[in-house]
Amino acid sequence: MASKITIFFVLALVVVCTMMVCIPTATAELVLPCKTTYDCVNLPCLGRPPLCINGQCKCTTTLTHQAKLDNLRTMNDAKTCKYTSDCDPRMRYSCVSGSYICLNGFCTCT
């Protein structure tokens, strides 16, 4: 009977020690070979455009030239300003780039 209790405690000790050990996890990254950017259209980039860089498909975070121009357009209800400090600091959340300036008397996303 004592041997069964001993085995139970040893087994419980092994289980507790196993649960305390941190097992490192690896983050997986999808690597697709490519020759042109067209080869990367199936890469899941969550709204970011994929590009072929050094023979591998990569998700980019850069804005296109047109997106930057669209972001520069002032809104009809844009606040007037003399200095950038006159603009509402919460405006950065509505700008794609996250930054703004006082341009030609209006608070404008950059």
UniProtKB/Swiss-Prot annotation:
One of its GO terms (cellular component) is extracellular region. The keyword Secreted applies. Disulfide bonds join C34-C52, C40-C57, C45-C59, C81-C102, C87-C107, C95-C109. Keywords: Antimicrobial, Disulfide bond, Fungicide, Plant defense, Secreted, Signal. It comes from the Eukaryota. The keyword Disulfide bond applies. It is found in: Secreted. Residues 1-28 form the signal peptide. One of its GO terms (biological process) is killing of cells of another organism. Belongs to the DEFL family. This is Defensin-like protein 296. It comes from Arabidopsis thaliana.
